[in-house]
Curated annotation (Swiss-Prot):
Protein name as it appears in the record: Phenylalanine--tRNA ligase beta subunit
Cofactor (UniProt): Mg(2+)
Enzyme class: ligase
Gene: pheT
GO terms classed as biological process: phenylalanyl-tRNA aminoacylation
Length: 811
């Protein structure tokens, strides 16, 4: 925002040099990006009176002028402007002056044989316009005097501060807001503009107080008749130009002036045009959401098709403006306008943001509404605009009607503790360079300076009532503490280190386990991935954002698997080969009784990640189901956990015959399997890609057990083992996991290993059965087992398989 220092000094009596003031504002969080000192643009430039003008003897396009500039004798100046003539007031750059905008230092020179002792300037040469058709000529009735500086006449006696503020400071987008800030930083006197009271005793039946106001809105309309549209007075034009706003006419310029001064967007409609649009003199103004397919031609001459997210102002239910963004071209103020409807409104920031985004249109008005306009000052800003309109454009106020549905509470109270302030901010540097804590007097002085009202409710505890113009950014105690630090000056706090206790810096058990899991996954060859939690909507179970930045990222993810598949596909299409990766993240979903979230771990792997294919004649050797399963098992073996695989067909993205649910000591852990062939074919992926998604909370619960906190070494047995092979026919519906569970249970402490080493389906095998062969290893840690010890246990295993699964023993 561009701030005129002269305008600012009318509101707050500050005599600091621009550089000093800029530094104070920057340290307080308002970064001054540029100091535009316009006083240097016209240093040495004075008002001159052209006494005579003669044709240059040696050039057709040059004139020789005698110009009075307040010196003893007129000076001779050669001028090339076509509009120079005698008896006009002009701006003259005297000898020795420097014009920074054109990088020119004036010195005596000869032009085609005639000596010139200065230069008659155009506005472009003084930096006021980009181009000029000739020299600038002052009005005859300006009461000028030869030799007086031109700076005050052209607004070149001012300094402009170009500053930016943080997004939470809605009040900083107004000159009064900056003036309040300067008052707080310098203890200067603040003087706000005087606002009169309009005579609203007259009413008119042609105005009907019928408002269809959208919840969360405040809307007032003031009818003014008998206005005269004309150029704005020079002082108003200068202030708008200094702020970087183009002048249009007196009415529009006044609304822009209030926008800069109070930060309150206003809009002036041509009332008669509104009546024509509505088709009735009985005017009904409304605020509603646009209907899909409605169109509106805005002031930038763009015909816009409105989305349902757009908020519109209506006349007779016909859209006439984008609420809080831009007015409509069909109701704009023109030279023929004599009746106005002055709109002053407060809209929900979210509603304006959606409306502006739906049209790809951001304006000075929408920028302020999006941050939050101070609704309590809306009547003051409206009356200030009415005062200026009556003063500059004439007319009579006929009526004013207000409709509101806003529930916004512009003032609220916050509990503030002195102890908490000093705990967070630490001591300050005193004048004697000793460190001391902030006192109660300091807190009251600083917060009172920004408009807060403090009531002491306990020993060094206040109830702080926040001013309405700061209700958007001062919401919690920590916000007030930040204000104390900002106003006192960050550089005035002492340099201290926080005390460290013996327990400081330790990782929580949960975080430590997560890091171990990540390290193990990297150790087995998986790369850690990270995806956005925001995804494209497509399911009723998704949690949808109330105010999304983009429609493609307007919902929260239901799982990690979708992102992992997308990442695998992207890497494959980019020629980077198969992706072996894992991700730890949070998923979200909704149910009838509310919203839920949980931590998950997912992974994906497939294809042939190996190198040295030349040894296989260039043939790929893709990882198979058992190898992928082995990667997952190795991860759990590193933590001393054994997982159980059971058939699973609940997710259509997985192969129905090569998918398993994972169980950990009776708790469902997740799912692992091969992606469905149709999914891989549709995405152009390798034929065999495997993925898993695990409930991280279940995993961490099993790891966070006292017996697992400290690793224990189990010595290897130094005694020989006794192996037994067990072969049998079994129904194909029986899983190997079920068989292994029974074998281990019956084998007891003596059974150390169970390994499936053969499977056969074919000739000589009964129908719907298969032949399986297991190798059972029996071992004791303190002795060599004898046949008498092994055989009874082994027979018990065999008998249990026959009884439980009706197997046909072959050995």
């Amino acid at each position: 925002m561009r701030i005129s220092l002269n305008w600012l000094r009318e509101l707050v009596q500050v005599d600091l040099e621009p550089e000093v003031l800029a530094e104070k504002l920057t340290l307080a969080g308002f970064e001054v990006e540029e100091i535009e000192d316009r006083r240097t643009w016209a240093a040495g430039v004075v008002v001159g009176r052209v006494l005579e003008r003669e044709q240059h003897p040696n050039a057709d396009r040059l004139s020789v002028c005698q110009v009075e500039i307040g010196q003893a004798e007129p000076v001779t100046i050669v001028c090339g402007a076509s509009n120079v003539r005698a008896d006009i007031w002009v701006a003259v750059a005297t000898l020795g002056s420097y014009l920074p905008c054109i990088d020119l230092k004036l010195k005596p020179t000869k032009l085609r044989g005639v000596r010139s002792e200065g230069m008659i300037c155009s506005l472009s040469e003084l930096g006021l316009t980009k181009e000029s058709e000739g020299i600038h000529i002052f009005p005859e009735d300006a009461g000028l005097q030869a030799g007086q500086p031109v700076g005050p006449l052209l607004g070149l006696d001012d300094v402009v501060l170009d500053l930016t503020s943080t997004a939470n400071r809605a009040d900083a987008l107004s000159l009064i807001g900056i003036a309040r800030e300067v008052r707080a930083l310098t203890a200067a006197t603040l003087t706000l503009p005087e606002v009169g009271t309009a005579d609203l005793s007259r009413t008119t039946l042609s105005w009907r107080s019928l408002y269809k106001v959208k919840p969360g809105s405040h809307y007032s309309g003031t009818i003014i008749e008998g206005v005269t549209i004309a150029p704005s007075p020079e002082w108003l034009q200068k202030r708008l130009q200094l702020a970087g706003i183009r002048t249009i006419n007196n009415v529009v310029d006044i609304t822009n002036y209030i926008l800069l001064e109070y930060g309150q967007p206003l809009h002036a409609f041509d009332r008669q045009k509104l009546q024509a649009i509505a088709g009735s003199s009985d005017l009904a103004i409304g605020v509603r959401s646009a209907q899909a397919g409605e169109t509106l031609k805005t002031l930038d001459d763009q015909e816009r098709t409105l989305a349902e997210a757009a908020l519109v102002i209506t006349a007779g239910d016909c859209p006439v403006a984008l609420a809080g963004v831009m007015g409509g071209a069909d109701s704009e103020v023109s030279q023929e306008t004599t009746q106005l409807l002055l709109e002053a409104a407060w809209f929900e920031p979210i509603a304006v943001r959606r409306s502006a985004r739906s049209q790809g249109l951001r304006t000075e008005a929408s920028a302020r509404y999006e941050r939050g306009v101070n609704v309590t000052e809306l009547p003051i800003a409206t009356q200030r605009a009415i005062d200026l309109l009556l003063q500059i454009a004439g007319g009579t106020v006929i009526s004013q009607t207000v409709a509101t549905t806003t529930q916004t509470e512009p003032e609220h109270s916050i509990t503030l503790r002195l102890q908490r302030i000093n705990e967070l901010l630490g001591p300050v540097q005193a004048e004697d360079e000793e460190l001391k804590d902030l006192g109660a007097d300091d807190i009251e002085r600083l917060l009172t300076a920004i408009g807060c009202h403090l009531t002491l409710v306990d020993d060094a505890v206040w109830q702080v009532r926040v001013p309405p113009y700061r209700y958007r950014d001062l919401e919690r105690e920590i916000d007030l503490i930040e204000e104390v630090a900002r106003l006192y000056g960050y550089d005035n706090f002492g340099e201290t280190l926080p005390p460290l206790g013996s327990d400081e810096g330790a990782l929580s058990i949960d975080e430590s386990l997560r890091r171990q899991i990540r390290a193990v996954c990297r150790g087995v060859g998986l790369t850690e991935l990270q995806h956005y939690s925001l995804v494209k909507p497509g399911s009723d179970r998704q949690v949808h954002l109330a105010n999304p930045l983009l429609a493609e990222y307007s919902a929260l993810r239901l799982d990690l698997l979708s992102g992992l598949i997308d990442a695998f596909q992207y890497n494959w299409e980019q020629g980077n080969g198969p992706l072996w990766g894992f991700e730890i993240g949070r998923i979200f979903w909704r149910e009838e009784d509310g919203f839920f979230e949980a931590d998950r771990m997912g992974g994906i792997l497939g294809g042939d990640p190996s190198r040295g294919r030349w040894q296989r004649g260039g043939k790929e050797q893709a990882i198979d189901w058992y190898a992928a399963k082995g990667v997952l098992e190795e991860i759990f073996e590193r933590f001393g956990l054994t997982i159980e695989f059971q058939p699973d067909r609940q997710d259509d993205r997985f192969h129905p015959g090569r998918t398993a649910s994972l169980w950990l000591q009776g708790d469902r852990l997740g799912r692992f399997g091969q992606l469905h062939p149709s999914l891989c074919e549709g995405r152009g992926l390798p034929a065999e890609v495997y993925a898993f998604e695990l409930d991280l909370d279940v995993w961490l619960d099993h790891l966070d057990q006292p017996e697992r906190q400290v690793p224990r070494f189990q010595p290897y047995s130094s005694f020989p083992a006794s192996d037994r092979d067990l072969a049998f026919f079994v129904d194909q519906s029986v899983t190997v996991a079920e068989l292994e569970r029974i074998i281990r249970r019956q084998g007891g402490a003596l059974l150390s290993e169970v390994e499936l080493f053969d499977q056969y389906c074919g000739e000589h095998v009964p129908e719907n059965q298969r032949s399986l062969a297991f190798r059972l290893t029996y071992r004791a840690s303190d002795r060599t087992l004898t046949e008498a010890e092994v055989e009874p246990v082994h027979d018990q295993v065999r008998q249990s398989l026959v009884e439980r699964f009706r197997v046909t023993l072959r050995s």
